[in-house]
Amino acid sequence: MPTAFTEEEMKRIRGELINVGIRLSKELGLKKMSVEKITSAVGIAKGSFYLFFESKEDFILEAAKYAGQETQKMLLLKLNGRTQMSAHEFIEFFNEFIHSGLDLMNGLTIDDFFWLKKHIKKQALFDPEAQIQTARLWLSLINDVRDGIDVGTFVNLIKSIYAIREHRDTMVRESLESSVQILLRTIEIYISGKGNIYD
C-alpha cells in the first residue's frame, strides 16, 4: 500500500519525480524509462508513483509541461525586459535550450518517437499546425526577420537538428555537435538574411 505523504512532501517528491524522469529519459529513452526506475531513483515505492500521476504517459505530459514552463523562463531571461531580440540572440537562446536539461527531445531514439506516437494522446508534438503556431510565436519575438520567410521551412530546419540526434547511431558521432552548430547558423541566416555560414 502506498505511503501517505504530507502536502509538503507531496510537492517535494512530485518535483523530484519530474526532475529524475527528465534525466532518465535522456539516459534510457522514454520507452525504457520505467515507473520502477523513476521511483527507485527518488526512493519511494513503485505504488506511490500513482499518488502523483495516473500513468507513465500522464507523467511524461507533466514533465513536458514543466520543461515548457522552465524554457519560457529561459526565454524571458534572454529577452531581459524587451519584447524582441535579434535572430542571433534567438539562436543563442535556442542553442542553450537544446543543450540544457529541459530539452526532452534531446536523446530520443526512433523507438522513443514510435512509443510517443502510440501512447501519448496529446499529439501537439507531431501536429504540423501546432508547430507552425509555435514557430510564428518565436518569429514574433525576433526583430530582424527578413521578408518572405517560410514558417514551414523554419520548422523543418529546427526539426532537422532533432533528426540528426534521433539517428545518431547512423551518423559520424565526432561531427554531431559541429553539424548541429552549422544547422543553427543556417537557421539564423535563413531568419535574418544576414551573414554566411562561416561568420
Residue ranges and their predicted role:
Residues 1-28, 37, 41:
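Basic, helix-initiating cap at the start of DNA-binding domains
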Residues 11-19, 31-32, 52-76, 80:
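An amphipathic alpha-helix adjacent to DNA-recognition modules
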Residues 13, 56, 63, 67, ...:
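Hydrophobic/aromatic residues within well-ordered alpha-helical segments
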Residues 20-28, 70-78, 157-168:
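Solvent-exposed, amphipathic alpha-helical segments
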Residues 43-53:
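Short hydrophobic/aromatic patch on the recognition helix
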Residues 62, 76-103:
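Hydrophobic alpha-helical connector segments
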Residues 117-159, 163, 178-181:
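Amphipathic alpha-helical packing segments from all-alpha helical-bundle domains
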Residues 136, 140, 160, 164-199:
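C-terminal peripheral helix-coil segments that are non-catalytic and often amphipathic
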